């Protein structure tokens, strides 16, 4: 089975994706290994710094004006939050882009 970062970087390479959004950074290892030219990370556990937004995803999406080629959702795993992240991600996804969802905790 391919590792998450291999899948993400493979999609970037295969599709020529330039911009990447990651919701939920964990320890930041995967985010730092992403090869996209432009990348934004969103996680309330981090401070606002550089390309990292230290906020909940709902707050980020209200203020966001950018669009992305690839969006990886791995924030809160509650089904309602993931649903909001999908809806909000769809609104800022470039044509021909991809949304990846890591996992969801039903109810």
Predicted regions and their residues:
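A short alpha-helical cap/connector motif
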Residues: 1-72, 76-107
């Amino acid at each position: 089975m391919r590792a998450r970062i291999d899948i993400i970087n493979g999609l970037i390479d295969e599709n020529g994706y330039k911009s990447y959004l990651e919701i939920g950074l964990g320890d930041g290892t995967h985010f730092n290994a992403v090869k996209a030219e432009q990348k934004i990370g969103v996680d309330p556990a981090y401070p606002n710094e550089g390309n990292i937004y230290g906020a909940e995803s709902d707050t980020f999406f209200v203020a966001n004006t950018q669009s992305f080629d690839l969006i990886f959702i791995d924030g809160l795993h509650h089904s309602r939050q993931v649903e909001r992240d999908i809806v909000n991600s769809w609104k800022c996804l470039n044509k021909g882009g991809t949304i990846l969802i890591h996992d969801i905790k039903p109810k």
